[in-house]
């Protein structure tokens, strides 16, 4: 006989959100360690006219990491609301999210710390594919979660 799980408490939901925020901003910190001298390096690059100014990266990435965390939290909540914990599709969606988050943190190291432009280009293409796939699977689990990743995909 199957037993029903009690509904998730507000406290547990908030702890989940804090956990996803902490994870996303930990990835940001890992990337940030590689980007300590990024300002001077970025200023020296030959950039197209449409490239954003260096000062814009901090505010934009703060917003993007927050949106990523909320999107992952919504998918996690969806999985938690299933009768037996995470449904297989929410687990797969969250694993894909973690893969793109790792690729995101790695890119700063490849480009800013190791200054390997060719590898950074290949890695950013992989990252974009991972973000696109994550956006799609998040959309299928919970539409709002997919929508929240669209600015990240566009950036």
Regions found by a protein language model. Give the residues of each.
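Membrane-interface helix caps and helix-loop-helix hairpins in membrane proteins
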Residues: 109-119, 140
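N-terminal membrane topogenic signal
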Residues: 7-21
């Amino acid at each position: 006989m199957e037993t029903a799980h009690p509904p998730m408490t507000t406290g547990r939901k908030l702890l989940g959100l804090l956990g996803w925020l902490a994870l996303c901003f930990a990835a940001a910190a890992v990337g940030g360690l590689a980007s300590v001298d990024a300002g001077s390096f970025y200023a020296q690059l030959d950039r197209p006219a449409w490239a954003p100014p260096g000062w814009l990266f901090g505010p934009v990435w703060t917003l993007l990491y927050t949106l990523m965390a909320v999107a992952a939290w919504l998918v996690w909540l969806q999985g938690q609301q299933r009768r037996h914990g995470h449904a297989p599709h929410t687990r797969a969606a969250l694993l894909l999210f973690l893969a793109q988050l790792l690729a995101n943190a790695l890119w700063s190291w490849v480009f800013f710390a190791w200054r390997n432009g060719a590898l950074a280009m290949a890695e950013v293409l992989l990252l974009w594919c991972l973000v696109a796939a994550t956006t799609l699977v998040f959309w299928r689990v919970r539409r709002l979660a997919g929508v929240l990743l669209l600015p990240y995909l566009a950036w």
